[in-house]
Amino acid sequence: MRVLLQRVKEASVTVEEEVVGAINAGYLLLVGVTHEDTEEEVNWLADKVTGLRVFEDDQEKMNLSIQDVSGQILSVSQFTLYGDTMKGRRPAFTKAAKPDMAETLYEKFNERLRANGLIVETGRFGAMMDVALVNDGPVTLMLEKNA
């Protein structure tokens, strides 16, 4: 599982001209699932996102977690995080999980974030989405348990 985390001032996701998820300050998470993932990766990454300290304290040091700043999460499924561009000019997605498995683990990831006390908005799994965001920093991190 890969999570591309972006610290944002605001973010939203629109499907067919309808806003299906929107947040104020917090994280936009682009979440990709591979066929080798289990609930172990799901829980590890959700807990990592919850505890990661990338918000600035009074001394402008990254020392606060999303919980510390009462931030929100917009979680968007993103199978293209597993695009392989080593051969040719078109990415191959053979490392991405099949949709049924990916959706199950993506939902478990979001449930774990909620169980950790976070407000989580989502996109719509498998849909074509327009994602809008205002980066904060910018701070962008790629998280992966077995990188």
Curated annotation (Swiss-Prot):
Q: Which GO terms describe its cellular component?
A: cytoplasm
Locations listed in the record: Cytoplasm
Q: Name one GO molecular function term.
A: Ser(Gly)-tRNA(Ala) hydrolase activity
Disulphide-bonded residues: none
CDD domains with a match to the protein in the record: Dtyr_deacylase
List the keywords (alphabetical): Cytoplasm, Hydrolase, RNA-binding, tRNA-binding
Q: Which GO terms describe its biological process?
A: D-amino acid catabolic process
UniProt catalytic activity: glycyl-tRNA(Ala) + H2O = tRNA(Ala) + glycine + H(+); a D-aminoacyl-tRNA + H2O = a tRNA + a D-alpha-amino acid + H(+)
The answer to whether the entry has keyword Oxidoreductase is no
Main location per UniProt? cytoplasm
The UniProt family comment states: Belongs to the DTD family.
Written domain comment of the UniProt record? A Gly-cisPro motif from one monomer fits into the active site of the other monomer to allow specific chiral rejection of L-amino acids.
Q: What does this chain do?
A: An aminoacyl-tRNA editing enzyme that deacylates mischarged D-aminoacyl-tRNAs. Also deacylates mischarged glycyl-tRNA(Ala), protecting cells against glycine mischarging by AlaRS. Acts via tRNA-based rather than protein-based catalysis; rejects L-amino acids rather than detecting D-amino acids in the active site. By recycling D-aminoacyl-tRNA to D-amino acids and free tRNA molecules, this enzyme counteracts the toxicity associated with the formation of D-aminoacyl-tRNA entities in vivo and helps enforce protein L-homochirality.
Assembly and partners?
Homodimer.
The name under which this protein is listed is D-aminoacyl-tRNA deacylase
**Naturally occurring in which organism (per UniProt):** Exiguobacterium sp. (strain ATCC BAA-1283 / AT1b)
What's the encoding gene here? dtd
